[in-house]
């Protein structure tokens, strides 16, 4: 399995999850089973937790209505009435899922939430599956980078104005890299600690600049 897309939309309204079963012959009998979302408040090692933010069972979704292919990126598709869900079907049934979850409905902040997205599969890969490729669960982590991106633009304007790199810019990059390294190495508890310490209170604030010529 792999994520085709895992991000928060630019308008901060939606958590977008697009996932597929790998397109190799040895995964012919493997289907997507469920998507479970934890946050920094519910995360546990070897998750998902017993009280996740959100659970989505793929099989249950196949009572949904159909829509025209041009209404969604999938081809062909079927979606729920509110067009939050998009699926392929037929020979690829339950091998591709796209969710666009309204973050307001999830009752969490788009700026201060670290999402842990688990995708589970069902079915058995063939016996010739390479070692390490037969996992039945993957985990993706996502935060809202839009506020950080906007703050970066402000800092870059300061660089243009003063020809000096602001200390706040360096500080922000180091903090973000610390979280990224923790996630990449699987040290999620430490990533959560850094997220809560460095970003959770400030990520929703409007960016500021000390550059007088840009205001």
UniProtKB/Swiss-Prot annotation:
One annotated Gene Ontology cellular component of this protein: virus tail
Chief localization: virion
Subcellular location: Virion
Keyword Lipid metabolism: no
Key words, A-Z: Viral tail protein, Virion
Keyword Flavoprotein: no
Subunit structure, as described in the record: Heterotrimer with THB. The heterotrimers further assemble as 12 docking hubs that anchor the trimeric tail fibers.
Free-text function comment from the UniProt entry: Forms the tail hub together with tail hub protein B (THB).
Name of the molecule in the record: Tail hub protein A
Organism: Bacteroides phage crAss001 (Bacteroides phage PhiCrAss001)
């Amino acid at each position: 399995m792999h994520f085709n897309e895992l991000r928060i939309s630019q308008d901060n309204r939606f958590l977008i999850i697009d996932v597929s079963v790998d397109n190799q012959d040895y995964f012919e009998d493997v289907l997507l089973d469920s998507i479970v979302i934890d946050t920094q408040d519910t995360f546990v090692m070897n998750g998902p937790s017993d009280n996740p933010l959100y659970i989505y069972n793929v099989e249950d979704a196949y009572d949904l209505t159909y829509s025209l292919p041009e209404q969604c990126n999938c081809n062909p598709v079927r979606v729920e009435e509110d067009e939050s869900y998009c699926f392929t079907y037929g020979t690829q049934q339950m091998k591709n899922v796209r969710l666009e979850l309204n973050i307001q409905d999830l009752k969490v902040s788009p700026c201060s939430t670290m999402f842990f997205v688990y995708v589970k599969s069902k079915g058995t890969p063939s016996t010739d599956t390479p070692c390490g490729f037969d996992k039945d669960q993957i985990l993706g982590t996502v935060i809202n980078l839009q506020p950080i991106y906007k703050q970066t633009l402000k800092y870059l304007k300061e660089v243009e104005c003063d020809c000096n790199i602001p200390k706040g810019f360096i500080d922000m990059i180091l903090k973000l890299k610390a979280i990224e390294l923790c996630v990449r190495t699987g040290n999620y508890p430490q990533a959560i600690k850094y997220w809560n310490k460095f970003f959770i209170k400030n990520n929703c604030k409007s960016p500021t600049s000390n550059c007088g010529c840009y205001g």
